[in-house]
Amino acid sequence: MRQVLSNHPIDHRFFFGNNGIRQGNPGMSDRQSNITGNRMLVIGASSGIGKALAIAANARGARVALAARRIDLLSTLAEQLDGSAHELDVSDPQAIESVVADVAARFGGLDAIVFTSAAVPFALIEDTDVTTWLHTYAVNAVGASHVLRAALPHMADNAVALVASSHDVGRPRAGVAAYHASKAALDEILRSWRAEHPELPVIRVSIGPTEGTEILRGADRDLLADLYRVWAQEGQIPAEMSAVEDVANALLSFIAVARANPTVVSDIVHLAPRTGSKQV
């Protein structure tokens, strides 16, 4: 890696995360946090927030089905959680329809669907080719919408859909143009879902910097070093990062609250790291 960061030592949590994931709190039984027995499909469950959420949901008594591209990782996790694993590329509409229908048939319906999949290509905007743009939109924006479309006929009364977005929408960083633009498109698509289906609680969660994800997996380290320097100059390096298991449990609580209070929905939620917080 080129030495371009002499004044800004690299925080390796930001680059590589923390692969350890704490179990969720299985003792939660209050009506506002209870998800026991909920039939839940978690898309993007092979790593990061999706994986942590699946683990926490299982610990809190939910029945989970897991979907992601990396079926080898998914199968191991599903076995641990007594759930089912489904290979899924969310840029493939037919695959989405097949997986959602299969899970709904196994469960007899869906109480919650969670979408955490994301494509995050790191490249300067002039180096981002059309194929990359189209794939990123297909995963992050169109894929999420098609999941909702496929799930709609199978959603039980008072079912909830939760979709992970990014707190960087409207404040883009250098080197992540396709990701930021696709997440902005996702936000507008979800607004349209709420406008056309006000009966369906669609919770859009803007998630800030989080430890324990694989957002930088496969990225060019030399490019990241240069980008890190630019982000530092622009004040875009987070002083703190949220723990992935805390984010996961917060997301599950949003689902529980929406199901416990059917006349309201947390339409837009922002999750940001708490500065100076200490893990208990």
Model-found features: residue ranges?
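Conserved glycine-rich Rossmann-like NAD(P)H-binding loop of the short-chain dehydrogenase/reductase
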Residues: R60-S75
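Catalytic loop of short-chain dehydrogenase/reductase
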Residues: V160-A185, L190-P198, G208-T213
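Conserved glycine-rich cofactor-binding loop
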Residues: S46-S47
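The beta1-alpha1 cofactor-binding region of Rossmann-like NAD(H)/NADP(H)-dependent oxidoreductases
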Residues: L88-S98, V130
